[in-house]
Amino acid sequence: MALNDFHVSEPYTLGIELEMQVINPPGYDLSQDSSTLIDAVKPQLTAGEIKHDITESMLEMATGVCRDIDQAAAQLSAMQHVILQAASEHHLGICGGGTHPFQKWQRQEVCDNERYQRTLENFGYLIQQATVFGQHVHVGCANGDDAIYLLHGLSHFVPHFIALSAASPYMQGSDTRFACARLNIFSAFPDNGPMPWVSNWQEFAGLFRRLSYTTMIDSIKDLHWDIRPSPAFGTVEVRVMDTPLTLDHAINMAGLIQATAHWLLTERPFKPQEQDYLLYKFNRFQACRYGLEGVLTDVYTGDRRRLADDTLRLLDNVTPSARKLGADSAIDALRLQVKKGGNEAQYMREFIADGGSLIGLIQKHCEIWAGQ
């Protein structure tokens, strides 16, 4: 299958996708009623889109093209309002978090959608196990070569994005000992992790052509890389974050990625090389396992440094770009988070350590998303 031409988009514009949990009180397991909610809210939308994801317990909120985080926040807030209203009318709850802590994958119903049914045929039970919840951020690029450079540049900071957003310590009723267990779900997929090395858009088109030979790849959407180009939108899409518990944190993560993209494309601080990726999965694992307490290893020098310290360095580097884009509030909030030394996975564990239950945890998450 031929690859779409790269659609020219305004650099640094934003799109945000949030995969939300649809919850069934009073037991607070996952519901299978996302279709009911989607049908109820679609006529009320004035911007953005609310749609299905893989299974009937998932609901995706997606903004339109936004010039800055304020516009994105306004669209997401409006969608949040109509979803919460519809959920209340149908006696359902909505919450964030990268995993549901005690759902059973065997109970998950794959959406009655041609693409997802085809994916179920290809991947079997792996698709039901992929009932996990992430935040994706699109950043606009002027051309395909810029998109490939940006993808490689952003890949340096995949551990930082994971650690800041980690919100999936529990799965199948157990503490996984990971800050972000969600990404482990995709480890069995043949396209898990970083995109195979290419140096420009022409080489990427050749890569896509070869991948399509497998008959498992019909479009870019069938590739589950941590970061991928989206030629139809003219963007690069970062896909490694857990869905946050609050809309504010989702906006902060989007602001960081937007500012990082601006810094990378204007300063060009890296000359991408294939060797950059030799320790990619090791550093990614550190972020998933330990969050901000993880340790990064420099592939060229062997130097090791705390992920929290390197994240503060990233925030300092992108601050001038954030100011130009109107995203400095996001950088300030994330800097405070790092200095306090926590993420949402840590909060969840503290809730349980204080005597809370996993059912109570999801109840609390629904209250947080509803602003209670």
UniProtKB/Swiss-Prot annotation:
Keywords, sorted A to Z: ATP-binding, Ligase, Nucleotide-binding
Example of a GO MF term: glutamate-cysteine ligase activity
Subunit structure: Homodimer.
PANTHER family, per the entry: GLUTAMATE--CYSTEINE LIGASE 2-RELATED
Mitochondrion is among the record's keywords: no
Designated name of the protein: Putative glutamate--cysteine ligase 2
Enzyme category, top tier: ligase
Catalyses which reaction(s): L-cysteine + L-glutamate + ATP = gamma-L-glutamyl-L-cysteine + ADP + phosphate + H(+)
Record GO biological process: modified amino acid biosynthetic process
Gene3D superfamilies for the chain: 3.30.590.20
Keyword hit for ATP-binding: yes
EC number: 6.3.2.2
Chain segments annotated as coiled-coil in the UniProt record: none
The family this protein is said to belong to: Belongs to the glutamate--cysteine ligase type 2 family. YbdK subfamily.
Described function: ATP-dependent carboxylate-amine ligase which exhibits weak glutamate--cysteine ligase activity.
Top-level taxon of origin: Bacteria
